[in-house]
C-alpha cells in the first residue's frame, strides 16, 4: 500500500479542516491499528501542537508511525473524556497510558432467595439477586474473610444441588464450619438469626452486633444453657479478633484511598479499599506507556480506566491533584450511572494520614517492581544474544499442548514481555481430529464445522482425538495462529518458543514457509532423563545446545515453559470435565436441556437420577410415564 503523506505532513493536511471544537482524535499506523487516542477542548489547537519543534521522543516516534488520522466532534469536554476512555479501553493503543491487568474486584455475596442463604465469593459488575459486601482488593482477601465468617457463623457455602442431595452432614459440619441445615441440624429461625448477624458484621455494625450477642449470652446463661452461651462467647471473641486483624477506620466509611508515586519515569498507583469502615485490602497498579507523562496525566487516565471496571464508592481520596477534576468526576458519574461522587486531596487530619500510608505502600511496591523490571530487562537482553535476535524481544510467545493418549487435546499460547506475563493475550486452541480438519477446510470454513461439532453431543467423537500426534497438534495450532497474525500484524512476536524437539522444529519451519513468514523461533525439549535443568535448545541452522541450569536466563526460560505447561494442563482438564459431563441423558430422544435440568434439579445429581425408579422419575415436571420408562431403560442398559 502506497501512502501519499504520513507523519507531521499528514497532520498539517488535516489541520485545514479541523474544527475548533471539543472532540477525540485517533492516530493509526500503516496497518490501521490505533496508535493513540486523545481528547481535546479544541481539536485544531491540539493537533497544531503535534507539528511544533519541541516534542519529546515518545511523541516523535508516534507521529513518525502515523499514517492515518481521524477525529470525532463531541458536544462537550465531558463527552470527549468519556469517548476517549471508551476507545482506549477498546483498542489499548500502544502510545496511550494504559492500565494493565485491571480485573473487577471480588465481592462476598449472600444469596437470600433460599430458605437457608448461601455465603459465597462473587466477581462481576452487575450486583443483583442477593446482598453484596465489598469489594475486596483480591481473591485472597475474600477467601480469608469467608473462612473467618464460616468459622464464626457457620453458614453454608455449598451449591443448591449439593445441598438438596445431602442425606448426612458433610465435612464442613465435622470441622465446625457449617450447622448442616441440609439435614435439619438447625431450624430456619435460628439460621436466619445467623444471617442477620453476618449482615450486621459485614455492614460495619459490629458494636451493635457484639452488644446483642452479649445480651443473648447472658440470657442463655440465666436459663442454664451454658453450652450455647459458651458458643456465643467464642463468637464474640472471634469477632473482636477478626475486627482487630482486618483494621477498622473511624475516619472513612466507604472510600477508595489512592496514591500515585513516580521513580525513574515509572509510576505506581496504590489503591486501598474501605467499606463500612473496614479495610478490604490494597493493590498496586503499574500503568504502561508513561514516558514523559506527568503525575496529573497518569492519575487522570488511571481514574477513568479504573472506574470503568470497578464499583465507585461514595468518596475517592487521592494524594495528588488532577488538572481536569470536575470533568473527570462527571465522566465517572456517567460511566457508572451515579449521582454523587467526591474526589478530594486532604492536607491534614485522619484522611491525610490514610493517604500518607497509601503513599508509603506505593513507594515500596514501585521499588519492588523496578527491581523485577531491571532483572527482566537483563534477562531479555541475554535472550536476544542467545538466539541471535535483531532486537530486544518485546513479545515472546510460548506454545505447549496437553492430552491423554490423544484425547481432549488442547494447544496453548502464553505471552511474555518486558514486565512479565501478559495474561490477556493467552490463547487456547482446541485440537481436532485430522479428518475433521480436512473436511472442514474443504467446506470453505476451517472452523465452522469443528465449532458446531464441539457444541453438539458428538464432542467425544470429534474434538481432541488426535491419536497422540504431537506434530499434527503443533501444525494445527501454528496454522491457526499465523492465520490470525495476518489479520493482526501488530501482534507479531519477536520470538516463538515451542515445547518440543528436532521433529517439532521441522513442523514449525514447514508452517512458516507455507505462510511465507520469518518469525524467529526455538524448540525447547527436556533432556535425556526429562529432568529440569538439562533442557536442550533446537534452532534452525545450529547444533543442539544446552545451558548451565544455574544461569538466570535458563531459569527464566524454564519459568516461561512451565507457565505454558501449566496453562495447557489446566485447559485440558477443563475440556475433559466438560466432555465427561455429557451423560447418557443426552442420548435419550425427548430429553433436551430443559428436561435434563429438571431431572438434575429434582434429584440433585446424575447418580441420583440413575438410582431413581420409574415411579420416581415420572414425578419430575415434564416427564410422563412413557418417557420415564425410556430414561430408566437407557440408564440401566449395559455398555
From Swiss-Prot:
Report the locations given in the UniProt record. Answer: Cytoplasm
Could you tell me which PANTHER family the record lists for this protein? Answer: UVRABC SYSTEM PROTEIN C, UVRC/OXIDOREDUCTASE
PROSITE patterns under this entry?
GIY_YIG (PS50164), UVR (PS50151), UVRC (PS50165)
Q: Give the record's subunit note.
A: Interacts with UvrB in an incision complex.
Task: Give the record's keywords alphabetically.
Answer: Cytoplasm, DNA damage, DNA excision, DNA repair, Excision nuclease, SOS response
Annotated GO CC locations: cytoplasm; excinuclease repair complex
Q: Which GO terms describe its molecular function?
A: DNA binding; excinuclease ABC activity
What's this chain's function? The UvrABC repair system catalyzes the recognition and processing of DNA lesions. UvrC both incises the 5' and 3' sides of the lesion. The N-terminal half is responsible for the 3' incision and the C-terminal half is responsible for the 5' incision.
Q: Name one Pfam family in it.
A: HHH_5
What biological process terms from GO does the record include? nucleotide-excision repair; SOS response
What is this protein's name? UvrABC system protein C
User: Domain named UVR: which ranges?
Assistant: 207-242
The superkingdom listed in its UniProt entry is Bacteria
- Cross-referenced SUPFAM superfamilies: C-terminal UvrC-binding domain of UvrB (SSF46600), GIY-YIG endonuclease (SSF82771), RuvA domain 2-like (SSF47781)
Per UniProt, residues of the GIY-YIG domain are 20-97
